[in-house]
Swiss-Prot record:
It comes from Staphylococcus saprophyticus subsp. saprophyticus (strain ATCC 15305 / DSM 20229 / NCIMB 8711 / NCTC 7292 / S-41). Residues 49-139 form the ATP-cone domain. A zinc finger (unnamed) spans 3-34. Belongs to the NrdR family. The keyword Transcription applies. One of its GO terms (biological process) is negative regulation of DNA-templated transcription. Keywords: ATP-binding, DNA-binding, Metal-binding, Nucleotide-binding, Repressor, Transcription, Transcription regulation, Zinc, Zinc-finger. Pfam families: ATP-cone, Zn_ribbon_NrdR. Binds 1 zinc ion. GO terms for molecular function: ATP binding; DNA binding; zinc ion binding. Negatively regulates transcription of bacterial ribonucleotide reductase nrd genes and operons by binding to NrdR-boxes. This is Transcriptional repressor NrdR. It comes from the Bacteria.
Length: 156
């Protein structure tokens, strides 16, 4: 590991512990040359996931895109950032557990919406309105009626 100050490759681990992230280890290191302390994170190497978009193009899966979309849909809503990270983590785990190399953007959106609906329904409608590309208010109302029907079933 290179020291961020002097670029020396000689450092020693001062402290190791599990990070807040899943499957990560936080290591506190000290450079043996300049004695600068710095932190590194060790993660399990993940096989790349390829997302097949609606137009057929392919790109590498980026969890940040899910998180950014969730943050936008939850603006000014009583949703904690940690909840959005949990949704993002759950979606990524589910996709990786399926063991496929390629996944459609439609499937990713469905996973996100299923989890978001249980966190905040207004944020769900915001996310769905962008994801599903509603053409008019009638389509949006149909989606909202589906939520209301789901609420009635779960309340019974």
């Amino acid at each position: 590991m290179k020291c961020p100050k002097c670029n020396s490759t000689h450092s020693r681990v001062v402290d190791s512990r599990h990070a807040d992230e899943v499957n990560a280890i936080r290591r506190r290191r000290e450079c043996e040359e300049c004695e600068t302390r710095f932190t590194t994170f060790e993660h399990i190497e993940k096989r790349p996931l390829i997302v097949v978009k609606k137009d057929g193009t392919r790109e590498q899966f980026l969890r940040e895109k899910i998180l950014n979309g969730l943050v936008r849909s939850c603006e000014k809503r009583p949703v904690r950032y940690e909840q959005l990270e949990d949704i993002t983590n759950n979606v990524e785990w589910k996709l990786r557990d399926e063991g496929r190399a390629e996944i459609s953007s439609r499937e990713i959106g469905e996973h996100v919406m299923n989890l978001l609906m249980h966190v905040d329904q207004v944020s769900y409608v915001r996310f769905a309105s962008v994801y599903k590309e509603f053409k008019d208010v009638d389509q949006l109302l149909q989606s909202m009626q589906g939520i209301l029907a789901e609420n009635k079933r779960s309340d019974s």
